[in-house]
Amino acid sequence: FNLYGKFFKMQNYLVLLLAIFALNSYAEIIGKANVTDGDTIVINDIRIRFTGSDAPESYFFGKTQTCLDENGKEWECGKAATKKLKQLISNQTVRCSDEGQDRYGRTLGICYVGDMDLQAEMVKSGMAVAYLRYSDRYEQQQNYAKKVKAGMWSGTFLEPEVWRKENRN
């Protein structure tokens, strides 16, 4: 009867269990994505809201967010943002980190196609704004979009968060 041997085996099991928990704590969601709007996708029935960016709404209580271009002409920036994200994904496999959940129960994530950060591309193209209240992760991309007057920055628009508050039923 060897107590030291039993203790050593138990210690190995504990190390193995800790390793498994550590791997599960950094979960990734990988698969084909269905685009809901410019900052939300669904992979394997998991609704993922991009963290760090906010896109105009394509459908919010029956309404689509509009913006004004450089000539003051109204355009459906919400639908344009959804279209842009669909183009970026282009039926490729998407990989998202699981960053927890928002207050609506959606999984928050940073999502990639290959090495391309989808949120960074959406902000850089002016089809989303950096969610600076939560993170400065995409501030450089937003500054670039403003400088070149990309997407929404070509004219005037309400920040998506403000637009949602004004258009809630």
Task: Give, region by region, the residue ranges found by the protein language model.
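Short non-domain terminal segments
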Residues: G5-K6, A19-F21
